[in-house]
């Protein structure tokens, strides 16, 4: 516990908040190029093959990003848009690829939550 005099001389130290998506460098999204597209198994109680991509961002940083939704058209050299947001059951994955932007297609036959998966409105 500092004295009043010590506080007058030095003041309080401001605790800086650590970014949860440092590779984006404060930007909401970043463009990148897929280096590798593969699958990964989730943490303990879950079982699946989650689709992931290794992406080299436009600032030169390489990150691993999750590909949401059922099915995708990504391959090496695809240009993608990456946003922040972790996947709870995949350790080390702190970014997601935005569906329906740049080279990424939207999810086929999606009826609900379409805006999150880049799907156009279905014809009646």
Swiss-Prot record:
Biological processes, Gene Ontology terms: translation
Pfam family of the protein (one): Ribosom_S12_S23
Function field: With S4 and S5 plays an important role in translational accuracy. Interacts with and stabilizes bases of the 16S rRNA that are involved in tRNA selection in the A site and with the mRNA backbone. Located at the interface of the 30S and 50S subunits, it traverses the body of the 30S subunit contacting proteins on the other side and probably holding the rRNA structure together. The combined cluster of proteins S8, S12 and S17 appears to hold together the shoulder and platform of the 30S subunit.
Name listed for the protein in its UniProt record: Small ribosomal subunit protein uS12
Gene: rpsL
Region ranges (Disordered): 104-124
Gene3D superfamilies according to UniProt: Nucleic acid-binding proteins
Composition-biased stretches (Basic residues): 112-124
Subunit structure of this chain's protein: Part of the 30S ribosomal subunit. Contacts proteins S8 and S17. May interact with IF1 in the 30S initiation complex.
Keyword tRNA-binding: yes
Family from the record: Belongs to the universal ribosomal protein uS12 family.
InterPro entries membership: NA-bd_OB-fold, Ribosomal_uS12, Ribosomal_uS12_bac
NCBIfam families, sorted: rpsL_bact
GO molecular function list: rRNA binding; structural constituent of ribosome; tRNA binding
Keyword tRNA-binding attributed: yes
GO cellular component: small ribosomal subunit
UniProt KW keywords: Methylation, Ribonucleoprotein, Ribosomal protein, RNA-binding, rRNA-binding, tRNA-binding
Modification type 3-methylthioaspartic acid: residues: 89
